[in-house]
Curated annotation (Swiss-Prot):
GO cellular component: plasma membrane
Segments passing through the bilayer: 22-42, 55-75, 86-106, 108-128, 148-168, 176-196, 216-236, 256-276, 282-302, 306-326, 344-364, 367-387
Protein name per UniProt: Purine ribonucleoside efflux pump NepI
Highest taxon of the lineage: Bacteria
GO molecular function (one): antiporter activity
Organism from which the protein derives: Escherichia coli O127:H6 (strain E2348/69 / EPEC)
Length: 396
């Protein structure tokens, strides 16, 4: 597929970045993330309206993640020869359809169908996001373009829940999803206007997705991705009980800590391109090492509110390097099969998020308050060591 990519990255694409297309992709990603997490702040009215429990309504988030994991694995096999411009438009249509189905849902089954449509769009879009980016900008600009996309993710993660809750009180949960559908329509038009034709992979160049794992350093990279994201979710999923019981934060104080984390994450994402230009491997090894030290500091001295707040800020700044860094690794080291590598990466991250949260919860309930921190720190340290020893990196 290397010849395919080279042939289809025209002279303009190589020398001049298409920022309008990059920002349209970033906006689409932000909309997907916002819609993914809208139910978190709307569970109570959704459950009451549909006559189900909040726990059952919460499965609308679970089904999205579950479908996204499988969609990410198989989407590139399905769309091999299709122009990626039409594929992205299809994902934006699925986003819009999902919002409308949820808005008009009169049963739990229809709600799940709507959320499954979102999962298809979410998993598919993430699977091809890295390869899309590398076909829209010159190679040296890829980290900057990825930082724009992940910056949009950071903003979406910060505003999704509070925005959904605020608007839900004003206009009702169904109209919140109607408004999200309007964002989906805007995505469709922006993509049609800005995204150029991006031919798919010719049939004679098809390759089994999982054969990529046989390449030197790729399996190590995917294991490192798994451990870093599992470590993140082992800690961050339980930041509320840890910070409220260990450091003594109240609800208002915790809100400020989470806001500080979100702002730091956005800043870290914005600065990531400058760091990754110097050394991707150093960033991918250094970031989890700093996080391992942060987990140790919080375990030992987390009862001090200043220390705990500082760790949250450092964590947000540092972890922001990891998703951008691994996407950059794919665009450089697996450029000839970036879509398939992206598919595996998304599935690994979804699995890691689930496992990290589950094991962290078990540790919290059965070992002690700081056990999620120790688990997270151990996984981050192992990630740093694995990246240093085994992960291969090609220069841009």
């Amino acid at each position: 597929m290397s010849e395919f990519i080279a042939e289809n990255r025209g002279a303009d694409a190589i020398t001049r970045p298409n920022w309008s297309a990059v920002f349209s992709v970033a906006f689409c990603v932000a909309c997907l993330i916002i819609v993914e997490f809208l139910p978190v702040s709307l569970l109570t009215p959704m459950a009451q309206d549909l006559g189900i429990s909040e726990g059952v309504a919460g499965q609308s988030v679970t089904v999205t993640a579950f479908v996204a994991m499988f969609a990410s694995l198989f989407i590139t096999q399905t769309i091999q020869a299709t122009d990626r411009r039409y594929v992205v438009i299809l994902f934006a249509v699925l986003l819009t359809l999902s919002c409308l189905l949820v808005s008009f849902a009169n049963s739990f089954s229809l709600l799940l169908i709507g959320r499954a449509c979102l999962g298809l769009a979410l998993g598919g879009f993430w699977a091809i996001s890295a390869s899309l980016t590398m076909r829209l900008v010159p190679p040296r600009t890829v980290p900057k373009a990825l930082s724009v996309i992940f910056g949009a993710v950071s903003i979406a993660l910060v505003i999704a829940a509070p925005l959904g809750g605020f608007l839900g009180e004003l206009i009702g949960w169904r109209n919140v999803f109607n408004a999200a559908a309007a964002m989906g329509v805007l995505c469709i038009f922006w993509i049609i206007k800005s995204l150029p034709s991006l031919p798919g992979e010719p049939s004679h160049q098809k390759q089994n997705t999982f054969r990529l794992l046989q390449r030197p350093g790729v399996m190590a990279g995917m294991i490192a991705i798994f451990m870093s994201f599992a470590g993140q979710f082992a800690f961050f999923t339980y930041i509320r009980p840890v910070y409220m019981n260990l450091a003594g934060f109240g609800v208002d104080g915790l809100t400020l800590v989470l806001l500080s984390f979100g702002i730091a994450s956005f800043v870290g994402t914005s600065l990531s391109s400058f760091i990754l230009k110097r050394s991707v491997k150093l960033a991918l090894a250094g970031a989890p090492f700093v996080l391992a030290l942060s987990a140790l500091v919080l375990t030992l001295w987390g009862s001090d509110k200043i220390v705990a707040t500082g760790v949250a800020i450092i964590w947000g700044l540092t972890f922001a390097l990891i998703p951008v860094g691994w996407s950059t690794w794919i665009t450089r080291s697996l450029a000839d099969q970036a879509e398939k590598a992206g598919s595996i990466q998304v599935a690994v991250i979804q699995l890691a998020n689930t496992c990290g949260a589950a094991i962290g919860g078990y540790a919290l309930d059965n070992i002690g308050l700081t056990s999620p921190l120790m688990l997270s720190g151990t996984l981050m340290l192992l990630t740093a060591l694995l990246v240093t020893a085994k992960v291969k990196m090609k220069k841009s």
